[in-house]
Amino acid sequence: MSERIVLHIGAMKTGTTFLQTTLERNSALLSEAGVDFTGNRFAYQTRAVSAALKGAGEKGRRYRRWRRLARAARQSEQDVSLVSMEFLSFAEDPQIRQLLKPLRGLQVDIVMTVRDQFLVAPAQWQTHCRNNGTSDWGTYLRQIEPRLAGRPRRNDAYRTFHRAQDVDRTLQRWATFRRVGDVHVITVPGRDAPQDELWKRFFDVVGVTPPPVDFGVAAPNTSLGYGSCDLLRRLNEHLGDVSGGRYRKGMRQLAREVLAQRRDLESRPVLDRRGAEYARGLNEQLRESITRNGYVLHGSLDDLPVPASLEEYDAKPVPVPELETRAAAEAAWDYLTDRAGAKGGKRPTSLDALVLEDARLLREVHGWS
């Protein structure tokens, strides 16, 4: 039976999808290496964690799925059980206490993957655009800065960014519990690193030789270009009444089947100098936190750069090229008119009218009244 469980608690936008997909699709190889990816499915772990973190409902019922997961981990014939679910980083003290209870008797180690904040901010803006957000890139950069977030009520962009990326606070919350053993931090290697480097670092934490897997089957998050993200946030201005689950299903389909195909045709949002100063400061805070608290580091602090000069960054954010947004909106219109069986219509000429028509077609195709 397992005597140790490793909880990979995030953070978001740090290679979690790559790791989770690879773990799930190679669960048999993991078993041969002495590792149990508990439940063998990421969806199983997601449901257990999501139910436990819900604010409403009777406490015992909320944690029922998590207790089942804990029981499965205990009963595993492997040496180590492994759970990877970034929503665990959202848990507050009372929730962490409840999550740890059924793991009593197991060695519980925590691991968090962290990434260069110069890359995280654009990735988080994309998440903002794909989840009802309406802020353009330049506005978003200012909104996530604490000094301009507003008091006493901070904006949604600020809340979601810092909820996902406040690594120091997250690790300190978990580390204060006596049932937590070692706390590990993995720095995500740079873009030029070998494809398997993050995998190797992850299995340094697990404590076994990483099994040889086919990374070709791993499914990283489908990233979008600048114009497509701008289209989504413009569409969101007309879809604020669509409920979360229905919204996500329809918009993910549009992103996957249409907008992701345009990625190589579009530019990327780039930090301005002030945004770069903020990212540099966040990297510096991460480095200090890892060193100060004595977390077990896998990788290098150099993966969290603190450049002396930021002269390469423009004074103001580079706006999205309107032609990119228009081309993305036209591609969406072609796709949606085909889905709606409305071929032969005339495409609107102005960008605002085209976005409005795309929003109307989304409602028609998905039954969003």
PLM regions with names:
Residues 1-369:
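Anion-recognition interface
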